[in-house]
Amino acid sequence: MMRLSFFIILISSYSLSLLADDTAVTLENHLAPEPLTAGEQLRSQFSYPAATRAADHAAMNWQQSHSCITCHTNGFYLIGRARSGSQAPAYLEARNFAHEFIKPHVDPDHQRKGTRTPGAEAMVATTAFLAISDMKIEGALSETTRQAFDYIWRIQSDSGAWEKWIKCNWGPYESDDHFGVSLVALALGVASRDEYTQSPQAAEADQRLKKFLRSHPPESLHQKGMLLWAAGYRNDLVKKNVVKKWQDELFSVQKLNGGWVLPELGDKNWKRSDGK
């Protein structure tokens, strides 16, 4: 459910004119999003191919214009596009970019002098996105992703969170400690078939994650949704009697078109600059 909502968010910034061509989207031919307007044309029926092309365009545009990994564009794209995009040029480019983004900071054989390591939020989230993508595409964690996990365990605090995580009220990614913890808990659940997750360092880090979640129960609907997602891959995060309660809470704010309004899932800090 949350995967679908993130996917809808990704595609909503594109008009239909971007989606008529069947040519594969690449870093070289992608189109930037057009301005949102109240009068933009809407489809009469949902089109999955159009949605995937819009996601490809969005991911490639963000990669080229910002050269980083973020939750609202190419980060969750690595998860949401995996099932249908394992051979899509844009998806393969995004996976390669994510590996190259993180490798110099976690692989001693590829370190670059003078390169500043990205902030905790970038390293942690990219590790989680890559881990889930690796499992969906390859069925196992890559060596770079394993090294990235080892890195984020070293900067994880005893509380279980990453206390240097930037918080500038840009929910859900840069708003609180809960997002990073639940995202990594999800990634470990998805990767549970990989032997790395049973290693001492991963097991100890996972205990810290669970300690944080016990002492910081979810408050917003988004936090509950993230844990419901993780609970689909592991049974040690949410009690069975709580799952139905949280599901009902999320469905109670679902709109008639099947989606959700993102600010309604967060706290007061998720409002736009105009207060809406």
Give short role names for the model-derived ranges:
Residues 19-276:
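Preference for long, amphipathic alpha-helical scaffolds in soluble/luminal domains
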Residues 5-17:
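Bacterial N-terminal signal peptides
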Residues 1-2:
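N-terminal secretory signal peptides that target proteins for export/translocation
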